[in-house]
Design a protein with these regions (language model features):
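Structural motif
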Residues: 20-22, 49-51, 70, 94-98
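Short, basic/aromatic beta-hairpin or loop at an interaction surface
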Residues: 179-190
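Flexible, acidic/His-enriched mid-domain "rim/lid" segments that flank
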Residues: 75-180
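Conserved small/polar residues in nucleotide/adenosyl-binding loops
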Residues: 196-201
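Terminal domain-start leader segments
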Residues: 1-46, 77-81, 85-88, 109-115, ...
Length: 201
């Protein structure tokens, strides 16, 4: 994944790339917790987090330099700006569709670094699955199938859709999901077209 990103950086004449989308952070680095950002340069990779996650980050990302921003800067954006200056980065790409104006202003406090907005770069990498990713998808499908087989037995009159969705999330974890799945929605009957509901089945 890093090789793909660095090839892109070279083609676009970028000295660095700043990653703030948590799914993309995980894809590039393998880091599974929240509150993490990456600054990738041509020769180094930095994972920016806060002290709560340092030990976890070191364990999961041994090839990364783990940096804590708290106490070193008012916010992550200004810390990333300082780091870009320190590393002598002249042009750094970032995920423009995820950045607030305030965050962008913080990045732009680096006087000698140009921040260049990009869109869908890492998502494009993610769209083509490696053999290892395909195997992981098969495992995920098996987990979902087993959880679905369990939830079928719980569907009966008087149980709410909200309760069933909660049980399904629980079964997913019990069957081997790394984390509680986000956004499970279980709806039946006449209200199926609604995204959120809690009526009884």
């Amino acid at each position: 994944m890093l090789e793909q990103l660095r090839t892109y950086m070279e083609k676009q004449n970028l000295d660095g790339f700043f990653v703030q989308n948590h799914e993309n952070v995980r894809y590039i680095s393998g880091y599974t917790s929240d509150d993490a950002y990456l600054l990738i340069t041509r020769g180094r990779q930095f994972l920016i987090t806060d002290p709560r996650y340092t030990e976890h980050a070191q364990a999961e990302c041994p090839d990364y330099t783990i940096l804590n921003w708290r106490g070193a800067a008012p916010n992550v954006g200004e810390y990333a700006a300082q780091l870009a200056e320190q590393e002598g980065l002249k042009a750094v790409g970032f995920e423009k569709d995820l950045l607030t104006v305030k965050f962008h202003e913080a990045l732009c406090t680096a006087p000698h670094t140009e921040w260049i907005g990009t869109e869908g770069v890492i998502e494009e990498f993610r769209s083509v699955k490696t053999p290892e990713e395909i195997e992981k998808l098969k495992v995920a499908c098996d987990i979902a199938s087993r959880a679905f087989e369990r939830i079928i037995k719980d569907i009966r009159v008087g149980v709410t859709e909200k309760e069933l969705a909660s049980r399904l999330s629980h079964y997913m974890v019990m069957e081997g999901s790394d984390t509680k799945p986000y956004g499970n929605i279980l709806i039946s009957g006449a209200r199926t077209c609604l995204l959120y509901t809690s009526r009884c089945v």
